[in-house]
């Protein structure tokens, strides 16, 4: 079963995300599918299929939706669980590209027995601007910060253009 369809107390992760988006008045929702796409049957959602899902990463799936990325857009990875305060912070940003990240991320990895820090998608922040998102280790200058990418990106109309033109 795709991770986004995992049931948690009677609701899938994706259903939880969609419910929260609707609470914020976001009703135009597109979901890019891949593995077991026939299992995605939620209503009021438009589905797009990434035929190369097994050989690509999330960015390629996002590019499947490239034509839908115009104007103000919110991109949420389908397999993440988040509090609505994180969504609220991202939505309230006036930046062209706002990325949800956890600057205290290393603490949560220290408490884990398997400690898979190397698997975390890291965000490099220079002067309050995101300049890189990478699963690789990021070299850090003293003035910069590194956070863990939380799988939520808000794009303004200009941010959408920047993303789709690159």
Predicted regions and their residues:
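N-terminal nucleotide-binding beta1-loop-alpha1 segment
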Residues: 1
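Conserved N-terminal catalytic core of the sugar/cofactor nucleotidyltransferase
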Residues: 6-7, 11-73
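Residue-level detection of beta-strand-connecting loop/turn positions
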Residues: 10, 44, 79, 127-128
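Short beta-strand/turn micro-motifs composed of small residues
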Residues: 33, 77, 101
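Short, glycine/serine-rich, charged loops/turns that create anion-binding
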Residues: 36, 52, 80-81, 104
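Short beta-strand-to-loop acidic/aromatic patch adjacent to the donor-nucleotide binding site
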Residues: 71-81
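Conserved core of the sugar-phosphate nucleotidyltransferase
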Residues: 84-165
């Amino acid at each position: 079963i795709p991770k986004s369809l995992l049931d948690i107390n009677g609701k899938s992760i994706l259903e939880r995300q969609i419910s929260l988006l609707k609470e914020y008045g976001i009703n135009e929702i597109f979901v890019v599918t891949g593995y077991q796409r026939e299992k995605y049957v939620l209503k009021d959602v438009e589905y797009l299929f990434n035929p190369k899902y097994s050989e690509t990463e999330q960015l390629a799936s996002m590019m499947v939706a490239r034509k839908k990325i115009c104007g103000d857009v919110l991109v949420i990875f389908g397999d993440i669980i988040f509090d609505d305060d994180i969504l609220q912070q991202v939505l309230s940003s006036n930046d062209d590209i706002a990325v949800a990240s956890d600057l205290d991320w290393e603490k949560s990895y220290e408490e884990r027995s398997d400690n898979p820090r190397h698997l975390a998608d890291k965000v490099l922040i220079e002067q309050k601007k995101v300049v890189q998102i990478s699963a690789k280790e990021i070299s850090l200058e003293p003035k910069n910060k590194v956070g863990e990418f939380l799988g939520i990106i808000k794009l303004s109309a200009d941010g959408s253009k920047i993303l789709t033109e690159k």
